[in-house]
Amino acid sequence: ELGAEVIGVALDPFSERDNYVLSGIGSKIKADLRVDIRDGERMKAIFREYQPEIIFHLAAQPLVRLSYEIPVDTYATNVMGTINVMEAIRATDSVKVGVMITTDKCYENKEQIWGYRENESMGGYDPYSSSKGAAEIAIASWRRSFFNPVDYGMKHHVALASVRAGNVIGGGDWALDRIIPDCIKALEAGKDIDIRSPKAIRPWQHVLEPLSGYMLLATKMWEEPTKYCEGWNFGPRAESITPVWDIATDVIKIYGSGKLNDMSNPNVLHEAKLLMLDISKAKFQLGWKPRMNIHRCIELTVDWYKRYKTEDAYDICLDEINQFINE
């Protein structure tokens, strides 16, 4: 609605109930392309054809437990896919801004009781987390080697930054091993909700929170190309960093029905128990801050799932965006 010409590059949707499918986004943008980012030459060809100016790179294999099953594919997508996007940027003169989205799990997790800052070590126990840490290292290398702010205007015209969000929730997500989709699937089927890691603490936030940060950052990078080419955290308020059990309990209250089962198992695949982000940098240097508390984030998310069967998904999204803007 703001007038941007959007070109989308992705694999097929996860399900026919995805927000992307139900809201008909593919028919509302300039181009909707089915491409695997592991195909570097195809990515370069797309960039040559469409001559984009701003890149938001979100494509990934995003699931921790699945990464144990397909570690090579996870690395190929999350590391080499990211490099392919940066190489396509490097080969296309039209690109001026690149915002590379990774994850809060890119940090070497020490289960510390304070939030990670942007200058802390990259790492990761599982293939997913470590692949994102590796992607961050690659982004930093490409920024220093090919998109160095010192050389802007002489050797290149690209501002490149990376962003790390917390655990994102929102309507229309049906992915595996995610707490909100798992809750909704069980509730719709009239079943109890099984919680495998009830005490795990995460920085929960509604999807519109980090997206607003990404867009603000891209705008500032466009206006001042050498000032913001760094890593940035976009996380929730401190009180929104809560255990999985509390999230599921709130979902049940808002949805109006349901029962939780504690399915804790010490023998399951390793997942971090405690993860928090420090967002001071984005607050003070960008003027960004989260608008909603955790209850409001869950309320807006559950609202989508309660409405999507009887209302137009695109209209629901516009309504929720307007609610978010007015928070």
Regions found by a protein language model. Give the residues of each.
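N-terminal Rossmann-like NAD(P)+-binding domain of SDR-like oxidoreductases, especially those catalyzing
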Residues: 1-165, 169, 324
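C-terminal substrate-binding subdomain of Rossmann-fold SDR/epimerase-dehydratase oxidoreductases
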Residues: 3-9, 35, 167, 187-327
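Short aromatic-enriched loop/helix-cap "lid" or pocket-rim segments at secondary-structure transitions
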Residues: 18-21, 110-113, 173-177, 207-208, ...
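A short C-terminal helix-loop "cap" of Rossmann-like NAD(P)-dependent dehydrogenase/epimerase domains
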Residues: 25-28, 119-121, 145-160, 183-195, ...
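Residues in well-ordered alpha-helical elements
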Residues: 40-41, 53, 65, 72, ...
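Active-site phosphate/pyrophosphate- and oxyanion-stabilizing loops and adjacent acidic/basic residues
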Residues: 44, 87, 181, 249, ...
